[in-house]
C-alpha cells in the first residue's frame, strides 16, 4: 500500500457466524482508521469423485448472495455513528479461499478472518483458511472468534 492510498481492510466471508463477526469487527476498525472494507468470498466446484456435481447450480451467484447477506447482517448495527460511513466493496472469486484472500490482501493494511468457517460453503474449504493466511499473508492478520462459539 502506498502512502497516498486509502487503507483497505480485506475480510474473508463465507456466511458463517464467525465470518460475520469478523466483518463486524472490521467495520469498527475501519471507522477508527479511516479505512475501507473489501469483503471477499471464494468458492470451488464441489469435489466428489465418481459423482458428478449438479450443473444447474450457479456457484458464483450463490457466493454473491451469501456475501450480500453477510454484509447486511454485519451492517445492521452500523446505521449511525462512525461505522455508518465505512465504505464496503465486495469481491467474489472461484478458487481456494486462502489463496484468494492472500492475493486480495497483498496491498491491504489488514486481513481479517473468522476463526471457523464452513458456513454455506463448507465444501469449498479444504483446510484451515485462518491458519494458512496467518502464516503466509504479507500484511497483519486478525482472527476473530464468534462470540457464540
Model-derived features: positions:
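Short, solvent-exposed amphipathic alpha-helices that sit
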Residues: 25, 62-74, 100
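General small-molecule cofactor/ligand-binding pocket signal
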Residues: 38-40, 89-93, 142-144
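Acidic, proline/glycine-rich short linear motifs
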Residues: 40-69, 91
Amino acid at each position: 500500500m502506498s502512502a497516498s492510498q486509502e487503507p483497505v481492510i480485506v475480510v474473508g466471508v463465507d456466511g458463517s457466524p464467525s465470518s460475520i463477526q469478523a466483518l463486524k469487527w472490521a467495520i469498527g476498525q475501519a471507522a477508527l482508521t479511516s479505512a475501507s472494507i473489501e469483503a471477499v468470498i471464494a468458492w470451488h466446484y464441489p469435489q466428489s469423485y465418481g459423482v458428478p456435481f449438479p450443473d444447474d447450480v450457479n456457484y458464483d451467484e450463490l457466493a454473491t448472495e451469501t456475501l450480500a447477506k453477510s454484509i447486511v447482517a454485519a451492517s445492521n448495527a452500523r446505521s449511525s455513528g462512525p461505522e455508518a460511513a465505512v465504505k464496503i466493496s465486495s469481491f467474489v472469486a472461484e478458487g481456494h479461499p486462502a489463496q484468494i484472500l492472500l492475493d486480495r490482501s497483498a496491498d491491504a493494511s489488514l486481513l481479517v478472518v473468522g476463526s471457523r468457517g464452513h458456513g454455506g460453503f463448507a465444501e469449498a474449504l479444504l483446510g484451515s483458511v485462518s491458519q494458512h493466511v496467518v502464516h503466509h499473508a504479507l500484511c497483519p492478520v486478525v482472527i476473530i472468534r464468534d462470540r457464540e462459539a
